[in-house]
Structures are given as structure tokens and as C-alpha cells.
Amino acid sequence: MNIVDIPLDVLKEIFELSDFITKIRFRQIYKYTYKNLHIIDFYNLEDNYLKKLTNNILKKHKFIKYLNANYNKNINDVSFMKNLKELDASGSICGVDQLGIRALDLNKLNANNNFKIKNVSFMKNLKELYAAGNCAINQSGIKGLDLIKLNACDNPKINNVNWMKNLKELDTYGDSAIDQMGINGLDLIKLTVSNNSKIKDVSWMKNLKELNASGFSEIDQIGIKGLDLIKLYANYNSKIKDVSWMKNLKELHAYGFSRIDQMGIKGLDLIKLYANYNSKINNVSFMKNLKELYAVGTCGIDQEGIKGLDLIRLNARDNNKIKDISFMNNLNILL
């Protein structure tokens, strides 16, 4: 049977299931395969292939939808890729610059630490943007965007995203300039504000399910009032003390000098608890669905505090208050 006798749909299915090198060779068999079979994924490649990508190589593949050019100084222009939807142009040595993305209509862009890209406001279908660190994208550069996910951690050039009514995930870690006014009215599902001293209150976000308010975050007890979280990071946060009303909370990170204490976890039905070095929590025996417990060092949890638990994973390193775990029949990881 000649290859041209195989239905094109079948050929395309075989082609998509092949690895990268096989695809390259398969296209070169006949003019027919070269014309009709196109490699669209230049993102999920092994590092040794990614490092070899250049402008000239990419120009031979004009149907690319997914491209990873992070830390690749040999790629600076992808503007000809009219089908491109996802681009990773992160890293300080990535060659892709402002001119190199002109007229692109991406869905997802990673420009973390790329100081050559400043403006993506023309990408009206952009839904995910990573503009963290030493990225040059500033407030004007995101004007009018309707994102679903934004990472602007440690980016002091972006301070306001409150018009993005469809935004669901926001990362404003550390030196991000996004402040209280900059998130006003947002209806997020996931928010990271760890070590961000400019945001204090997220209590109106009734659909928020995951909050990271660790470290020097200014979010306090009033700032989480009424939230119905599934996952909370409050490590080293001295302003949050009580989360006992969060009946759907399944994962709690409250280690270090977190102020969350025994009363603050009363009645919770967690699956995973991190209480390393937290001397204020001493008993979790009532958490009958708890599967992972981290009670390292000066954590207050003792033998009585784990009575009857059926854990899968336990880390009680340097905690001399826990001596017997023989009753945990399903324990398979002990650290």
C-alpha cells in the first residue's frame, strides 16, 4: 500500500502520536506528507532539542501552535507564526523581544524575567499571562486585557488589575505593586499574596478557594472573615489566628510562628496539615480524615494529639513528643 492511499485523518493521528524526531523524518518521506503533516508542538520537547531551535528552523514550521523559547537567545522573532497560541519567552537571555511578538494573538504567554517584552495589550484573546520578576511588562502593557490567570509576583510595574472581571487566579507575591485598590471587586478562585504588604482584605471574595497569605502578608483575621476556603497558606503569618469556621477547608499550612492555635482549628476536617514548628497546635486526633501530617521540631502535637489517626504520610522529624505510630495501619511514608 502506498502511503497516499492511507486516509489523511489516519495519517494525522499516527503523526500526532509520534515523537519529535519521528515526526521530522515522517514529513520528509514524500512531498505529500511534507505538505499535509505539520508539527504544531515545539513546547513539549526535550531540552537537547529546545536548545537547538533557531529562527531559521522555526521558519520552516509555520503552523506551530505551542513554542518554548525560554532562555533561548537564538530565537528573537516569532511574529510570522499566525497560528501560535502558547509561547514561553521567559528568562533574561531569551531573545524574543517586543518586535518579535508583534501582531500575535496568543492565549498564553510566559514572559517572566524577560526585560525585552513590554506591551501585550494588543493580544485581545490572551487568557494567561506570566509577567513576574524582571519582566518589562507594565501597567500600560496590560491595558484592556481580559485575563483569567495573571502572575505578577515581584513585578513593581503592575499595580492595578481591578477591571479584569473574569480573572480567577492572581499571584502578587513579594515585590508586586498590586495593592488593595488594584484588586477591588475581583471575584477570584485562587490568590497568592505572600510577602505582599499592600493587600490586607479579601473578605468579599466569596468564591475564593485557595489563599496564600504567608510570611509578611498584611492579610489579617478581619481580612479573611467569612471566606469558605479549601486550601490556606498562613505560614509565618502573625495576623491570622482562627480558621475554625472554614468547614470545607482540607489543606492548612500553619507552620513557624503562625498564630493559628488549637482553638483556631477547632472542628476542622482536614486532609493535610502542616504544623511544623508551631507550638500552639497540640491535638489533631479529632481529624478522622487526616491523611498527611507534618509535625516537625517544636510542633506542639504529641502522642495524645495523634490518637486514632489513620495517616498515609507523617513527618515528625525531631519531634520527641511522638513516639508510637504502630496503630497507623495505612502509613506508607514516614519521614
Predicted regions and their residues:
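N-terminal Skp1-binding subsegment of the F-box domain
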Residues: 1-32
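Short, T/G/N/S-enriched strand-turn elements that build extracellular solenoid repeat scaffolds
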Residues: 53-60, 75-80, 95-102, 117-122, ...
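Low-complexity/repetitive intrinsically disordered segments
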Residues: 327-330, 334-335
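Leucine-enriched alpha-helical scaffold segments used for protein-protein interaction
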Residues: 61-65, 70, 83
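Hydrophobic regular-secondary-structure patch
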Residues: 23, 34, 38-59
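Concave beta-strand-loop units of leucine-rich repeat
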Residues: 44-50, 67-74, 88-96, 106, ...
